């Protein structure tokens, strides 16, 4: 018996990005093997994306839907208002390279920066996910 509640399997929804059965998904059901895009120590299993206690955290299902629809493995995904890092975790689960920025970073892989002036060269991202406060 698993030590964590079973999450529904990941699947693309045909009609909406905003339908999600839980705040987070089980990354063991995410597509793709481990890759250099995944952070050190990543392994499939009972971990969450981002921090469920972070105020305003975007459901990882929503980010997963967007990245599955509009990006490919190896793409660079930028989140200029990264919060607890949910976008970075979902990007890693899907073999995308995540770059996260926030005024008040909550972890080491998020760079402190103002979304109005990110320290990135022009045209360096394949997709930008932002869920402003």
Name the predicted role of every residue range.
Residues 1-133:
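Class I S-adenosyl-L-methionine-dependent methyltransferase catalytic core
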């Amino acid at each position: 018996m698993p030590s964590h509640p079973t999450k529904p399997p990941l699947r693309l929804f045909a009609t909406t990005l905003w339908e999600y059965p839980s705040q987070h998904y089980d990354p063991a059901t995410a597509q793709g093997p481990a890759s250099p895009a995944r952070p050190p120590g990543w392994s499939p299993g009972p971990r969450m994306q981002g921090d469920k206690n972070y105020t305003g955290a975007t459901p990882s299902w929503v980010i997963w839907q967007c990245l599955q629809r509009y990006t490919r493995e190896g793409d660079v995904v930028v989140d200029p208002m990264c919060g607890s890092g949910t976008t970075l975790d979902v990007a890693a689960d899907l073999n995308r390279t995540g770059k996260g920025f926030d005024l008040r970073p909550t972890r080491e892989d998020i760079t402190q920066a103002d979304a109005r002036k990110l320290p990135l060269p022009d045209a360096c991202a394949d997709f930008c996910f932002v869920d402003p406060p």
